[in-house]
Amino acid sequence: MKKIIFATGNEHKMVEIRAILSDLGVEILSQKEAGIKADVVEDGSTFEENAMIKATEIAKIACQMPEYKDAVVLADDSGLEIDYLNKEPGIYSSRYMGEDTSYDIKNQALLDRLEGVPDEKRTARFVCAIAAAMPDGSCEVVRGTMEGIIGHEIVGENGFGYDPIFFLPEYGCTSAELAPDKKNELSHRGEGLKKIRKILEQK
């Protein structure tokens, strides 16, 4: 394994990924940087299924390219589960209210749906499933989670997505108020990447 391709065009994710996997001693590329153009339909019913679909489809393309035939392809599917809302938005987190809708609007809509709901019923978690499609055709998948509650207002500038409404009681702040290194330590994606890292270290 000399290269890792992460099947995303999300620059925020790439910053987190590189921070956690950088000392593996391999080149880490986004799908765009690898020159792979593909719009994979994620039609699975779980985070894990969607991550595996994306990783294996991009790996099929990568293995046809001489420079990436030995690359590992990683893909994630992540989202927010709010218990009071029957785990919505769940696997539809990025598509909630439409993919072109800003997260300021999405976050406010979720706060409005939870108006008057007490903190003990506002439990939620971020989930991140990460799949690793190996050059030998095998695929492994792991899950990372971060538990918290949905706050009462949009707070914080450091994160993205639903971070500004995801409150961590033990730290007294939202995920969007955490310093980047602390977020990598605590986050669902950080946990998933650390699990994948252990798998990759054995390859």
PLM region descriptions:
Residues 2-5, 11-203:
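Anionic-ligand binding patches
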